[in-house]
Amino acid sequence: MVTTTEKTNIGYITQIIGPVLDIEYPSGKMPQIYNALLIRGKNQAGDEVSVTCEVQQLLGDKQVRAVSMSSTDGLVRGMEVIDTGAPISVPVGTITLGRIFNVLGEPVDEKGTVNSETTFPIHRAAPAFTNLETKPSVFETGIKVVDLLTPYRRGGKIGLFGGAGVGKTVIMMELINNIATKHGGVSVFGGVGERTREGNDLYNEMIESNVINKDDPSQSKIALVYGQMNEPPGARMRVGLSALTMAEYFRDVNKQDVLLFIDNIFRFVQAGSEVSALLGRMPSAVGYQPTLGTDVGELQERITSTNEGSITSIQAVYVPADDLTDPAPATTFAHLDGTTVLSRGLAAKGIYPAVDPLGSTSTMLQPGIVGEAHYKTARAVQATLQRYKELQDIIAILGLDELSEDDRLTVARARKIERFLSQPFFVAEVFTGSPGKYVTLEETIKGFNMILSGELDDLPEQAFYLVGNIEEAIAKAEKIKADSK
């Protein structure tokens, strides 16, 4: 949605280079940086066109350089360009829930227009330092492996790493469900430069798992903003800001806890790099834009906790050629509070969520923040799993019987821990037939302590697979015992 004004300030296209346009305005009527410009008229084929651009540079000599948010095909020099006098603005509020928008805040789900009384500009200042929540607090997700080993910070930023088919989407949907049911919060999903098919699949999966209510969108738990792979770089560069702006409304006005998903943060950087050279900037390392740090910082600094609400962000991070030193992921890492790494090995074993307990990290896992009991339990779990990992080669060559008594006990407990880290999800009920479980942090710590202390050494390891709290595992063990008689 773009604020339209009277035709008072009209310029003319002087040059078109792909998605970048040069526009000349009368003397003293130059539009400001980030203003939205509208091109409406007929192209050479006689078809109506409506293109929105955003001012990026003032070139001097009465010219501005702007980046288009949609295809520039058919535009010609001399076409009229109207300065709207304001940045691109998007609709905000509960009216956005259950709907899909593009970068301009226009609905693209064929469900009719969105008549929002309130719109926010996508370029906004980060919250003032005095309004920030400075005391770190843990954001309970109800997912055992996350809460115990990689606790999320309320208002923090978490990187989600994982290849195709290891369960990124399912974890995202479970988090969306849990924040809505347990925290009374909402979510915003920013699809930045990913495949159109994935966006479509995600929408349908959300309808299937009741995250989106198709009949009454206002009962949905999420708003979706898409800027797909096939769209011009201008749209991909700004769609993250459009999603963030919708999330900021829920935080600042509705005073809610918000989850913001960005899939994929790398594509945001990639789009900026595509536009940068066309804007005449000198490329930096590996061909990225020289403003890489600023671009990422402007987005990330707005994702934070205030005294009244929080935006906790989970960002899928694509690592080009698995090179963590590439400037794009390296710049992103500087802003992250934690990483959740999904392991294909665990997914192959059928352990879901397939979060790697040794590869995932969190800055929140400190005794001063989570408490001594939580910290000790988490470190003991990791130490047991690490020892099991070291022993796997010996087991593969010599067999389990060749291990010492202590090591055999460690292996048995590690296998129970590994299985107890799995959990049935609410959003996967449709596929698994098992009812979903939300496990509080207290129950999680209690369960793992009981396994580590040896209290449950006599229970079969399959009793710990896909259960919620430890009481369920004990009940499942009794059922297995009764069935085997």
From Swiss-Prot:
Its EC number is 7.1.2.2. Transmembrane segments: none annotated. One of its GO terms (molecular function) is proton-transporting ATP synthase activity, rotational mechanism. ATP binds at G162, G163, A164, G165, V166, G167, K168, T169. It is an enzyme of class 7 (translocase). SUPFAM superfamilies: C-terminal domain of alpha and beta subunits of F1 ATP synthase (SSF47917), N-terminal domain of alpha and beta subunits of F1 ATP synthase (SSF50615), P-loop containing nucleoside triphosphate hydrolases (SSF52540). SMART domains: AAA. PROSITE patterns: ATPASE_ALPHA_BETA. Belongs to the ATPase alpha/beta chains family. Produces ATP from ADP in the presence of a proton gradient across the membrane. The catalytic sites are hosted primarily by the beta subunits. F-type ATPases have 2 components, CF(1) - the catalytic core - and CF(0) - the membrane proton channel. CF(1) has five subunits: alpha(3), beta(3), gamma(1), delta(1), epsilon(1). CF(0) has four main subunits: a(1), b(1), b'(1) and c(9-12). NCBIfam families: atpD. This is ATP synthase subunit beta. It comes from Cyanothece sp. (strain PCC 7425 / ATCC 29141). The gene is atpD.
